[in-house]
Amino acid sequence: MSGLKEIRGKIDSIRNIQKIAKAMEMISVAKIYQTQRRMLISKPYAETIRKVIDHISSGTLEYKHSYFLERKIQSVGYWVVSTDRGLAGGLNINLLKTLLYDFNKWSNEGITIRLAIIGSKGASFLRSIKQTEIVSCVYGIGDAPKMSALIGSVRVMLQLYDNNQIDRLYLAYNKFINTLTQSPQILQILPIISSKNSILQTKYWDYLYEPDSKVLLNSLLQRYIESQVYQGVVENLASEQSARMMAMKTASDNGEVIINDLKLFYNKARQTKITEELTEIVSGASVI
């Protein structure tokens, strides 16, 4: 009977794990809607700033900000957005695989790679990559990240860019497409790529700026980059909750399959045990 007790113990253990997975799935479902709301709120902010930047740039053609100018690439920088927690399927792995492909390409060309990492899972992996230099790490931003938690990382990378220690800046994160689909994304942040709907191509009227339009442009560019990084973080959070929800659902479903298999095995073992006992009783009775 010890074998039957072990099987019952395994069934109970898997049921307990299944309950935990189901609870985590439901928590992720609730968090997805909250994160999607933040994502949708932050997106128009960045888009509006970009429109104003395009407008100001169009009115000051004699002044070209360095953030719009291409340079000879000797060093590149990445903001890498990962998760602080696991149990999110292949979310981090898929992003890191995409990054490693880029890193190998730059490394083969002799280009320095500098990283600002957001999320402990990315940091623990990327510390082992010898071809990169980590200049900033941000952990524990939580499920409701604030811009203030990211400003330090943004300013470190922008300072390196301003000092010509980085010639191109990227943002790597998981783009939220829908609840079932998340895609690794590497977005060029600097130099800023000209908008397809550039206001330069059409007639426009200008504003009177106070302070000077150049001062305003400098400030807006920093706000725009901060908003781009923040948008990447909230999209990655939405992707994380979706991936965790699906991972926990899969775990719960797989647990049910294993329980059914163990029940079948348990019933067969129990039937065999009963048959053996009946055979022994019948044999004993015939001897008497």
UniProtKB/Swiss-Prot annotation:
GO cellular component term of the entry, any: plasma membrane
Gene Ontology annotations of biological process type: proton motive force-driven plasma membrane ATP synthesis
Name of this protein: ATP synthase gamma chain
InterPro entries with a match to the protein in the record: ATP_synth_F1_ATPase_gsu (IPR035968), ATP_synth_F1_gsu (IPR000131)
Gene Ontology MF terms: ATP binding; proton-transporting ATP synthase activity, rotational mechanism
Taxonomic source organism: Blochmanniella pennsylvanica (strain BPEN)
UniProt keywords, alphabetically: ATP synthesis, Cell inner membrane, Cell membrane, CF(1), Hydrogen ion transport, Ion transport, Membrane, Transport
PANTHER family: ATP SYNTHASE GAMMA CHAIN, ATP SYNTHASE SUBUNIT GAMMA, MITOCHONDRIAL
Subunit structure: F-type ATPases have 2 components, CF(1) - the catalytic core - and CF(0) - the membrane proton channel. CF(1) has five subunits: alpha(3), beta(3), gamma(1), delta(1), epsilon(1). CF(0) has three main subunits: a, b and c.
Family: Belongs to the ATPase gamma chain family.
Localisation per UniProt entry: Cell inner membrane
Entries under Gene3D superfamilies matching the protein: 3.40.1380.10, ATP synthase, gamma subunit, helix hairpin domain
Organism taxonomic ancestry: Bacteria, Pseudomonadati, Pseudomonadota, Gammaproteobacteria, Enterobacterales
Pfam family, one: ATP-synt
Purpose: Produces ATP from ADP in the presence of a proton gradient across the membrane. The gamma chain is believed to be important in regulating ATPase activity and the flow of protons through the CF(0) complex.
NCBIfam families tied to this protein: ATPsyn_F1gamma, PRK05621.1-1
Its membrane topology: Peripheral membrane protein
